[in-house]
Amino acid sequence: MANWLNQLQSLLGQSSSSTSSSADQGLVKLLVPGALGGLAGLLVANKSARKLLTKYGTNALLVGGGAVAGTVLWNKYKDKIRAAHQDEPQFGAQSTPLDERTARLILALVFAAKSDGHIDAKERAAIDQQLRGAGVEEQGRVLIEQAIEQPLDPQRLATGVRNEEEALEIYFLSCAAIDIDHFMERSYLNALGDALKIPQDVRDGIERDLEQQKRTLAE
């Protein structure tokens, strides 16, 4: 795997030594202690969202299947998403390779960060400077720059999702990175949930749990 991708995985808290078999175990292995806070701190402007992502980065985003929702509820979420994809025979049969999954999570984080329409030239320059300061090589910076330049496209994030764990991680990460205080953010999450076929009760549960976590961190 390219060194620049390893660096981005490090910022996401992913182990560069992860194998396809470990990736099959989902976020428990994909986002390990130290996860997400580094990259989220560079891309997410909202203070409470950044605190939340940093918290789960420090303690592992998901522990045993769901630090926020709890393992039992998290598994119920997955069951409901799997049922929503029952007309897709191959869904759940395999996992996306780790490098593709990394790039997709980065794209999801960038899309969430700009879902209110605000990543201007000054902010982009600041992001690039911080990425350079974090030691991310040119190819990694280009990946993020390209993601920033792309129009918001929830369907693109959903394309290639192979199982319920991958669908859930994208929606969870996006909700964690967004404070829904603008109709554009709500519209984006609605479109993303539709594209990923996340049932409405699962969306509501994730948002409710994350909002409670954000309120707790703000106290």
Swiss-Prot record:
Keyword Transcription (UniProt): no
Pfam families membership: DUF533 (PF04391)
Main location: membrane
Keywords: Cell inner membrane, Cell membrane, Membrane, Transmembrane, Transmembrane helix
Topology class, membrane: Single-pass membrane protein
Cellular component per GO, a single term: plasma membrane
Cytoplasmic side: 75-219
Periplasmic side: 1-51
Transmembrane spans: 52-74
Compartment(s) of residence: Cell inner membrane
Superkingdom, natural source: Bacteria
Protein name: Inner membrane protein YebE
